[in-house]
Amino acid sequence: MKSFEDAKYEFIDFMSNFQSPNDSLQFLDWLKEEAIEEFISNTVPEELVVKRKQLNEVALYSRSQVPNFEGINSTENLQAPKNSEEGLNFVNTVHVDSFLYDDADVEELTEEGKIPTHFCKSCGTKDVASAEMITHSMSREDLEFVFEGLLPDLSGKTILDIGSRLGAVLFGAFIHSDAQTILGIEMNGEHCDLANKTCLRFGMNERIKVIHSELSTKIEVLAQADVIVLNNVFDWFAPIDVQVQLWQIIRQNAKSGSLLVTIPSLDDALRILPQNAGIDLKTWVTPRPPFRPDRVSKNKLDESISSIFLYSVN
């Protein structure tokens, strides 16, 4: 094993052997911009390795209980969003559950032809376009970012996931945080049954509670929550007038000081609704940076803060 002084002198000697000063500068740039970050990213604490393994096991079990890669069951009533800025619909969109299938899984399914990557704009011709891939669940990587880096220590706190589906956020919160109470509210009974089954199998039912209900009939849970998670929550599942009502319910009942984790940003979620659902974001919430950015790699931090948003309620 080398001492620090030995390594330092060997490095200086190594740098003196480049053919030109330009080569040595290029090497230092690479070291600074890529190699060091990659080394740090690959140096994962043992505790985090264990957590990742646990969440992977939960995801694989959940996947075995779901008949398709979409994570959508036959009793769900999905509706193509009429107010989508991207013009998303059932023809140009592919649904893939990112909790059940990570990037490597998706690549494999695509290569096998099980996930379509294009759609025909005019049947019978070569007029094709790339399909848009969306998910209604957070990936395991994103869950790690949210509960390890984005949010503060949640010991003794209550988390509420609105539209908890198969339970991805609930499981991520259980494994990656010390939250005392983890609530999921979900209107689809099949999803609730599977989430509860998974909780029992992995011994998570002491801290996790899945509520089979619409949000409008369980308003009181909003006032209990210290953290509220809203992940692509309404636009594929409710008509526009109902979306407006639901956002108003959240606006009126989320307690001051609570944190909102949203995908997409609140600006984007409300902009597509009539008159921003009557909500003035400046008076309601304050955007927040990650509480513990040092706990995630810079690459993951840069990637995630552009797609996962945090606010505190004023």
Residue ranges and their predicted role:
Residues 155-165:
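Conserved class I S-adenosyl-L-methionine
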Residues 187-314:
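Domain-level detector for long C-terminal conserved domains
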Residues 181-186:
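Conserved SAM-binding motif I beta-strand of class I
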Residues 1-136, 264, 271, 277-279, ...:
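Intrinsically disordered, low-complexity glycine/charged-rich regulatory or linker segments
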Residues 157, 180, 226:
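Conserved acidic residues
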Residues 167-179:
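Conserved SAM-binding loop of SAM-dependent methyltransferases across substrates and taxa
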Residues 115-120, 133-156:
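Conserved alpha-helix/loop element of class I SAM-dependent methyltransferases that forms part
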